[in-house]
């Protein structure tokens, strides 16, 4: 009983659990007034996230180094935090053609679409789920919890830290247990939600903004983009094929037919096609350049250009 009392007291002190003064009469407002209020609250998030940019940049560098060394980025969270983790991780394979960005959600995959909040309190499950991933010194683990005290996530981060992985806490409340358990923290103090305690709102939005920066920033540092183009896009359907062709046209200056031919000759590998077009080299040489540059597209183009035959024959 004492434990429950302490938990309740600690929870009520969190800023994300407190009542938002501007929303006291939420149920009496018109639809437009509700929309304006939520929009106004959301408008504060960019500035809140901006104050954490140095820590976000540190996370980008850590993740890029981990992925460059063959390690993984693993997100872990419960409830809404786990779902936004899954969303960012799921977008990395089609966008960057990498499968080493993964997620763990309390309650397992079924929790993505159903209520499994009871799993949030299961520390043992958090440790076990993390242990199954066998985290180590080459990995970066990001624990996401707006409160900074979710038992599942806290236990997972503690286990990962013990195993030698680099750990990062992403939370909305400073000085939390999760922050203390990790190597460092990214804190976005969004304040009280429009709907008191509903961290699926500002807290989740701010955290998705942070995850966008970390994953996109790390992939950019690794050279998995070219300029601001998704050159690692996987053309698995017609829409993505057209996108890949458009990217090749823009990046290389080639016409549509030449871009399509290069994409076909590359076996559907957009970066290979770009190196072929930009450096005017055959497929094998483009593949070799990308391998030598560890997938860094701009460096691969430079390498292939230096070694291209004078005739430029393909």
Model-predicted regions and their roles:
Residues 17-20, 57-61, 72:
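Short, positively charged patches
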Residues 62, 156, 214:
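Aromatic/hydrophobic pocket-lining residues that form π-stacking "cages" and hydrophobic walls in ligand
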């Amino acid at each position: 009983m004492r434990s429950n009392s302490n938990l309740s007291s600690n929870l009520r002190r969190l800023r994300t659990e407190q009542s938002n003064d501007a929303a006291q009469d939420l149920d009496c407002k018109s639809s437009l007034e509700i929309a304006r209020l939520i929009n106004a609250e959301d408008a504060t998030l960019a500035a809140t996230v901006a104050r954490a940019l140095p820590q976000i940049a540190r996370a980008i560098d850590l993740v890029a180094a981990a992925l460059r060394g063959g390690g993984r980025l693993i997100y872990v969270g419960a409830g809404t935090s786990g779902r936004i983790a899954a969303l960012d991780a799921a977008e990395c394979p089609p966008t960057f053609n990498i499968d080493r960005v993964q997620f763990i959600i309390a309650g397992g995959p079924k929790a993505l679409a159903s209520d499994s909040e009871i799993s949030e309190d299961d520390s043992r499950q958090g440790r076990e789920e993390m242990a199954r991933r066998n985290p180590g010194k080459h990995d970066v683990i990001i624990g996401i919890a707006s409160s900074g005290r979710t038992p599942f996530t806290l236990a997972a981060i503690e286990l990962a830290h013990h195993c030698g992985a680099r750990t990062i806490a992403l939370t909305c409340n400073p000085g939390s247990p999760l922050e203390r358990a990790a190597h460092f923290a990214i804190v976005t103090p969004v304040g009280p939600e429009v709907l008191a305690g509903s961290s699926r709102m500002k807290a989740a939005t701010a955290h998705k903004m942070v995850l966008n920066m970390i994953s996109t920033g790390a992939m950019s540092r690794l050279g998995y983009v070219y300029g601001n183009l998704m050159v690692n896009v996987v053309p698995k359907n017609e829409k993505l094929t057209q996108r890949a062709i458009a990217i090749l046209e823009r990046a290389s200056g080639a016409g549509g037919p030449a871009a399509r031919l290069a994409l076909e000759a590359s076996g559907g590998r957009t970066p290979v096609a770009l190196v072929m077009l930009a450096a005017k080299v055959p497929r094998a040489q483009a593949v070799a350049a990308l391998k030598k540059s560890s997938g860094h597209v701009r460096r691969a183009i430079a390498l292939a250009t230096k070694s291209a035959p004078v005739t430029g024959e393909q």
